[in-house]
Amino acid sequence: MVRITGDFQQERVLHPAATSLLTEFFSKGWPDPAKLNNSSRQASILQEQVRQSFAKALNVRGDEIEFLGEPDLGFQLAIQGLLTPDNKLFYSSIDRQRVFAVAAYEKNKGRDVTQLQVNNLGQIQESSITANDLLIWQVANGETGNTQPSPKSGAMVFADCTSSGVDLLPNFDYQTALFDSTSWAGPAGLGILIIKSASKWRNPLPHNDLARTPGTYSLPLLLASAVALENYLAQADNRSKLKQEIISFISAQITDVDIASAPNGLGKFLSISIKGVEADRLLLDLEETGFAVDSGSACKSADMQPSHVLAAMGRPIAGNIRLTIHKEMTEQIVKEFCIALKASVAKLRGN
């Protein structure tokens, strides 16, 4: 088995600072914070401290935060929780598959639903949206890293921050937002739902109490996510520079490559399509040289399938690989990857 020296895959191991404390978190976080006994009271104190830590990092109030044990459930809660019978729903052709599913469900129920198109940079083209409508707004795309300008319509907004995380917080008003713990090297299975307009939001799930969410998240994983976030924010960030180095190398050294990622997008994501090679063969060949990359859609339900994001942008789909540049990446690893990529492409093209 070849040792992976450069891991550019989107999935990431838990931040080492959180990993080292996992046993402690599970020893402290097992009680139910809602109960009255001493151990539960201690757990409740920990939970509140974590809530305030997240509130500061995400630039929200503590009472606007809901923790989720299933991040994908947050899309349904954030979107359907704002909808009333007379709202129109607008989403974009580059949104996540979970958004597509909610939009299709609402359309099947008879709601007026519109899919907004994007240009070749992946920027959403707003059209005919009023203040009474709900607009789903992806802060940054999880494949290309391309970011959106602030929405102009004045509609209610659900901000999808699952890819952007704390690397780019919304600079516009929104009613709900969703974050994924994995975006800052936290544990999987933890989402953070923000409900800023509580008066406009109603729990769309079957329920018989005033709880806004199921509350089935793991407190130990919540503690781990908070530590991961704190350490993630403290790390130096050289990713934009490394991304530009890769783009510059490819542009100068490898022909017939379409780079879908804008240079001014998030530094952590890069999507390229290379003419004359099969993506899966390129992925496996790079792995043989010690480099792991992704291919296909970033949406879990469509892994290794052609990217609907690139198709919506009018970009080539064949020969596409995706890189996630992590904070611990070094210039040396990037240089070695570029050399390996050039060699693999030449090999697969038969040059």
Please give the residue ranges for each predicted region.
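Pyridoxal 5′-phosphate
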Residues: 1-351
